[in-house]
Structures are given as structure tokens and as C-alpha cells.
A protein has these predicted regions:
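Conserved beta-strand-loop-beta-strand hairpin that lines the nucleotide-binding pocket
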Residues: 1-10, 54-134
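Bergerat-fold GHKL ATPase/HATPase_c domain
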Residues: 1-46, 134
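Conserved ATP-binding N-box helix of the HATPase_c
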Residues: 37-62
Length: 134
């Protein structure tokens, strides 16, 4: 592994869909350096894309979108957040029944919603599918 465990990589971009590709690319780069298989890297990229899209649709006009990546034992933890305050209910009440929830759940090994400093965030953990439990 080329990325030390528990080292954070943080990227902040303007909160516009045109910049989400930067977050996906950085996530793929960090994941590749943790020796995740290509399919797992693709899953992480798609999860970052979906999480970013959901946060951008909150409609609170956040100025920035931030991705924090951390190499963990056997995978990568990613937290995507927007600046500003969360909606009255976070996650939105119907989110667990949505296609976005199903997509994020299928692409990640762990999925949670957070409110660091009162700002909405989506946390995704992707572990290596090639890792042996023996």
C-alpha cells in the first residue's frame, strides 16, 4: 500500500456538477494506491458521483463540495459534504426508499449520513473484494 492508513486527502471544489469529475478522479487515484481492485475502484468512483449528486440537489446553494478520503485497512473511507446547514431532516425522509439509496448501498460496503459541523455529508466505505478473510 502506498497511502499510509489513516492519512486524509481532502479536496474542495465549487459546488457545481461540472467539478464532480475532479472528486471522482482523486478518489480513484487514492483507491488505486491502496491496492483496491479495478472493479472496486469503479464502484467507489460511482458512489462518489452519486453522493455528490444527491448533495448538490439539496437546493441550499452551497458554495463548495468537499471530499475527504482516508485509506483504511483493506479499503477507502470517503466522506462527501457540502458547506452550509443541513435541511430540516437529514437524510430526507424518503431517501431510504429511493433509487439513489439503492445505488449507493450496492456500490459501498458501509453507508451513512453525517452532519459534521451541521453540514450534510454522505460517508461511503469501500473495502477490497479481493481481500481474503482467512
Amino acid at each position: 500500500m502506498n497511502v499510509p492508513v489513516d492519512s486524509d486527502v481532502v479536496v474542495t471544489v465549487p459546488s457545481q456538477a461540472a467539478f464532480v469529475h475532479v472528486l471522482r478522479s482523486v478518489a480513484a487515484s487514492v483507491a488505486a494506491r491502496t491496492d483496491l481492485p479495478v472493479d472496486d475502484i469503479d464502484d467507489l468512483r460511482m458512489a462518489i458521483d452519486e453522493a455528490s449528486s444527491q448533495l448538490l440537489m439539496l437546493g441550499s446553494s452551497p458554495a463548495t463540495l468537499t471530499l475527504r478520503l482516508r485509506a483504511i485497512d483493506g479499503g477507502v473511507e470517503a466522506v462527501v459534504s457540502v458547506d452550509g446547514s443541513a435541511p430540516a431532516e437529514w437524510p430526507p425522509p424518503a431517501f431510504h426508499d429511493s433509487l439513489a439509496w439503492n445505488v449507493l448501498s450496492a456500490l459501498s460496503d458501509e453507508l451513512s449520513f453525517e452532519l459534521p459541523d451541521g453540514a450534510p455529508a454522505i460517508r461511503v466505505v469501500k473495502r477490497s473484494s479481493a481481500r481474503s478473510d482467512a
